[in-house]
Design a protein with these regions (language model features):
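PLP-dependent enzyme catalytic core of the Aspartate aminotransferase-like
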Residues: 2-3, 12, 86, 90-97, ...
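N-terminal small-domain helix-loop-helix segment of the aminotransferase-like
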Residues: 11-108, 412
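Conserved PLP-binding catalytic core of the aspartate aminotransferase-like
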Residues: 44-45, 319-372
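Conserved core of the PLP fold type I
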Residues: 66-213, 224-244
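Short Gly/Ser/Thr- and Asp/Glu-enriched loop/turn motifs at secondary-structure junctions
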Residues: 99-101, 350-356, 381-386
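Generic enzyme active-site microenvironment
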Residues: 218
Length: 412
């Protein structure tokens, strides 16, 4: 009975499967004796979900009409979308980006933003260019929309962004396609925590501005709140898009799941930036149509929560202060893991910020994972490496973790 395009499709979710094993181990051996590095949410040192006190306080004081009513607009609340744009593009973006057309739509999380973009800009049978180290759901979104997955090597031999392979893949696909969707997940890349430099971004934008095809660049910025770039550094990168040609569309995928630690509320946004008024009008027309027929509208409570915090100076200050403490916690955990990894010569991908550190293993990755599970250490497999969720592992459990991983690798 299934439609042909859905026949044979089945969700295989490695993350939830391993997480279930970790929970079983905790039930059998006690939480103190298990390292559960599978969780992709921010946890405190007591291994409980990190909840911002200001978020909890504001949410519980929202009026009922903001919590339980439909959104006043299919594309999202006006005050929410205005604050999303300021957060991503800078408070003065209307002045600094005067020559560009910008529009945004509320989505159910960052997943909704990416899915809604690919649905509307991908033709069946076309390739979508993804990084070879990536969040696996990207692939499923492409496949659901009858696309073909192509990957570029994320890292070069020096651990930097592999511009050469990125360019080669785009040039090759350009020979057979008039339009191409590309995803760059940065900063705080999932699963590696890597971050591109200003120079790397400059090289990317210089290259794509010279393309003849239509290029839709999805900037997955789900974890950007946990990046420690200064506002000056962010503005330098933002300025690189000021002279976009009309055939380039930048699409930011934003998520409140990470920004406010409200994963279950499913609130995000997609922000389109173009030098073409026509391109942005197409975005408004087509994507609002997709919103209405797919999820109708997004949680009004989550949107009002973000807008209230961001537009109230005292609340925003409290939020930023709490966020900085969590950023310090993440960096302390990451630095501890990397320092101990260096001591035992355990390789890892270059981490700058975010929730995860990834260790390349090689062909024995499955054996290593099994051996770690025998030690009650649970990690997530990515390609031929393992992802460590430093976001959820308390600092005391990170002590000695690098050596235990290295010992498992050295067995095979």
């Amino acid at each position: 009975m299934l439609a042909k395009k859905y026949t044979g499709k089945k969700l295989v979710d490695n993350i939830f499967t391993i997480s279930r094993k970790a929970k079983e181990a905790i039930a059998n051996h006690g939480k103190a004796n298990v390292v559960n590095a599978t969780i992709g949410s921010l946890y405190n040192e007591d291994e409980k979900l990190a909840v911002y006190s200001v978020v909890e306080e504001v949410y519980r004081t929202l009026p009922p009409e903001d919590l339980y009513a439909y959104s006043t607009n299919v594309i999202g609340e006006d005050d929410y979308l205005a604050e999303v744009e300021k957060t991503l593009l800078g408070n003065d973006y209307k002045e600094s980006m005067k020559g560009l057309y910008i529009s945004s739509i509320a989505t159910p999380g960052g997943t909704g933003a990416i899915s809604n973009t690919i649905k509307n800009y991908l033709n069946a049978g076309e390739k979508v260019l993804l990084p070879n180290w990536m969040w696996g759901t990207y692939k499923n979104i492409v496949l659901e929309n009858e696309g073909v997955v192509e990957t570029y090597e994320l890292f070069n031999s020096n651990g930097g962004f592999n511009l050469e392979d990125f360019k080669n893949k785009i040039n090759e696909i350009s020979k057979t396609q008039e339009s191409l969707i590309v995803i760059i997940n940065e900063p705080s890349h999932n699963p590696t925590g890597c971050r591109m430099t200003y120079e790397e971004w400059k090289d990317v934008y210089t290259f794509i501005k010279g393309l003849k095809i239509n290029l839709i660049l999805i900037r997955d910025v789900a974890y950007f709140e946990y990046d420690d770039r200064t506002e000056e550094e962010k503005n330098k990168i933002r300025a690189l898009i000021l002279d976009l040609p009309a055939n380039i569309l930048i699409m930011y995928a934003f998520s409140l799941s990470k920004s406010l630690s409200i994963y279950g509320m499913r609130v995000g946004a997609q922000i389109a930036v173009s030098s073409s008024e026509k391109v942005i009008q197409e975005f408004k027309d087509a994507l609002s149509f997709s919103c209405r027929v797919t999820w109708s509208n997004v949680s009004k409570g989550g949107m009002k929560l973000f807008a209230k915090i961001m537009t109230t100076p005292e609340l925003k200050e409290r939020f930023l202060k709490e966020k900085n403490e969590y950023m310090k916690l993440l960096m302390n955990r990451a630095n501890l893991l990397m320092t101990e990894a260096d001591h035992v010569t355990l390789k890892y991908f270059p981490y700058k910020s975010g929730f995860f550190v990834t260790i390349p293993i090689g062909p024995n990755v499955d054996k290593v994972i099994d051996d770690l599970q025998a030690k009650n250490i649970f990690v997530i497999k990515f390609n031929d490496g393992i992802r460590i969720g430093i976001c959820s592992v308390p600092t005391y459990k990170i002590v000695g973790l690098a050596k235990r991983i290295k010992d498992s690798i050295d067995k095979f």
